[in-house]
Amino acid sequence: MSRRHAAEKREVLPDAKYGDRVLTKFMNNLMIDGKKSVAERIVYSALERVEGRVKRAPVEVFHEALDNVKPSVEVRSRRVGGATYQVPVEVRPSRREALAIRWLINAAKNRNENTMEERLAGELLDAMNSRGSAVKKREDTHKMADANKAFSHYRW
């Protein structure tokens, strides 16, 4: 790791169909073994399913679902005099987005529908309506931070 300066963040290109950078990040996270075309097919068909069910712009639904999953606080371990405390800290905007994307994908993978398109569409709809595993993960994270509010003075 260089001490001179931090590595520059690379901007992802907007996706082909909707022209949305966040959607590209989502596809990149979903991608396995560099198979981007497979990830694109899964995401686009999931968004088509969502559009068929709610009669709204699919990207709008995607962003609403993502906003409902983004955490505002999380806990980080801090060692103080032999004891480890779970210290609540605010989450940076870039990390919020990354966590929300990761949680949505993991929640979709753990669902019981047959295809990944169905799972992803179901999880996006659930997240849009503030329910589902990804939203539960966010609420659990917030509860953990709230429970450890007493240690917030150990913040860095």
Curated annotation (Swiss-Prot):
Keywords tagged on the record: Ribonucleoprotein, Ribosomal protein, RNA-binding, rRNA-binding, tRNA-binding
The keyword Lyase is annotated on this UniProt entry: no
Protein's job: One of the primary rRNA binding proteins, it binds directly to 16S rRNA where it nucleates assembly of the head domain of the 30S subunit. Is located at the subunit interface close to the decoding center, probably blocks exit of the E-site tRNA.
Record-linked PANTHER family: RIBOSOMAL PROTEIN S7
Gene3D superfamilies recorded: Ribosomal protein S7 domain
Name this polypeptide is given: Small ribosomal subunit protein uS7
Subunit record text: Part of the 30S ribosomal subunit. Contacts proteins S9 and S11.
Organism: Rhodobacter capsulatus (Rhodopseudomonas capsulata)
NCBIfam families: rpsG_bact
Pfam families: Ribosomal_S7
HAMAP family associated with the record: Ribosomal_uS7_B
